[in-house]
Amino acid sequence: MINLRAALVVGVVSLLWATTTLTLGQLVGVTLLLYIVTGGYYTVWLAYNTLPRDLRAGVRYLRVLAKVKWATYSNSNIPRMFMENVRKNPNKVALIFEDQKWTFAQIDEYSNRVANLMVSDGYKHGDTVALFMMNQPEYVCTWLGCAKVGVVTALINFNLRHAPLIHCVQVAESKAIICGRELQDALKEAKDELKLPVYVSGCGNTAPEVKDAKNMDQLLSTSDPTPPLELDKVGSFDKMLYIFTSGTTGLPKAAIIKHARYLFFCTGAHHMAALTEEDIIYNPLPLYHSAGGMVGMGQVLVFNCTAVIRRKFSASQFWIEAGKHNCTVGQYVGELCRYLLNTPPKPEDTQHKVKVMFGNGVRAQIWEQFTSRFNMPTIAEFYGATEGIANIMNMDGKPGACGFVPVILRHVIPVYLIKVDEETGEPMRDKNGFCIMCEPGEPGEFVGMIKRNDPLRDFHGYADRKATQKKIVQDVWKKGDAAFKSGDILVMDEFGYLYFKDRTGDTFRWRGENVSSTEVEGVVSKVAGNKDAVVYGVEVPGAEGKAGMAAIVDPDDSTNLTELLVELKKNLPTYACPLFLRILKTIDATGTFKLKKLALQKEGFDRNLIKDALYFLDGKQNKYVELTPELFARISDGKAGL
């Protein structure tokens, strides 16, 4: 309706401009009058509330566009951009790690040695090596050196063992493995099956523990420290990295990261979060993941910032170290912000210079609590999958929002919410066979339109071609077009702000209503004292849909179930209150702090299988009661009155 009205007004005003002698002021008056007469006051009201935001975003987006387009036009690459920073500031500190400070020049020299070692050992442009190493400066130097000669690096999660580790190395078609000294035991368990050359980093003059492995430190000491000749052969659309998905629902998938893709990710974060090269970034995230390795490290490599990294995230040390190193920016992902809230209050909570936290995954339920406690002016929440092209950012700190899109010039940013079937998760189609766009307030799957050979909109997919095809929906708005399916359900308000609602497949139906597991998780976690909690639907014999089940990590068994139920009923509709509770000692999480619930979901509420404490919401008694074998049998036989 808005677009039709706008077209009508533009048409009439254009006709008047061409056929009359009205002044510019008169034309403006006619335009406003026409718009109001045709019901455009709502659009004027929307414009008043959103145009300042959209104009600021537009200016920043143009900077992103200019940077990425120029780089691809000149066929540049990430190492070359880094080397330009080396030329300008060779002695500036790039990385701080424990008691070490690495300058741009030191990173450049180390990465040159890696690059020339790869060439001398016979690895060529397009080959892949797997990097299995803990967070440390050598990690970044190693993949940067490989990138200088066109060797692709598969960044392997250092928490993986056995089959998942073997899978990741093999799916990337790795020709060698570079392993950190601390991870040799894990690699020894898989080496016989992998049968690949191994380089071990960090051994110094000590022989590696892995049989037949090469001592990388010794090899680098004699490698050429000058820039490799092969650097000029590396282009913007060459593969640079494989970064693996978190693997919350199965084995990780290897997402293809090209130089242009890496640049877009870090450039988008830099400009939309209004960072500068003077910023010092506290980055405690795993460097094998896109948040830490692309968004975070990209600020160093491309934008000349300084970053503080650590071997593993520590909630107790976060603000202490951020203050110690005068950090101005902090990074988060997943449940990290909640972990920080769970630490005992201390003076360092506010004795820091961090002006903005940027990342993705902070829950709406703790947003304002976090900003208040840690004196945080801005949370720059962004949304975007490692491999995806549906990317947005909340640049003005709207609580709970993961980003926004313009509402007046809606199609400037080619990302949309489309309606999906609640049962199958497949896109719904209109009578012409095309997708249906959601209205404000309607949940839908977030998609981004694909444009081939465009650095901002091309979907490069995964190493597995079948997995790539599953993420593409065809014939979205017209015959032949295509979009990337995020797999996430979002909802948009009237001002264009988008809010994460759930993963497709995580929403379940109970008592004729849709229940968002993500929304219920946020409430359960908060009322349980910010404990780890996951929510999922379980099948109940004789009942339609799936009943909600919440699993709460409470090793001390300190949760008061009576108080919990009171708070749940205050904050949730009746149908969304979990019917079952499971009290856990611990729960598995990914390296990016996403809680795993697939195994729990498969176990359901089976009292004979589960050894943890289980409870059932008895409607007659209005309380959670222990799920005894007898009660389990009654529910399973359909005799519990559900």
What do the predicted segments below correspond to?
Residues 263-280, 288-328, 343:
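Conserved AMP-binding/adenylation subdomain of ANL enzymes
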Residues 570-595, 612-637:
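AMP-binding/adenylate-forming catalytic domain of the ANL superfamily
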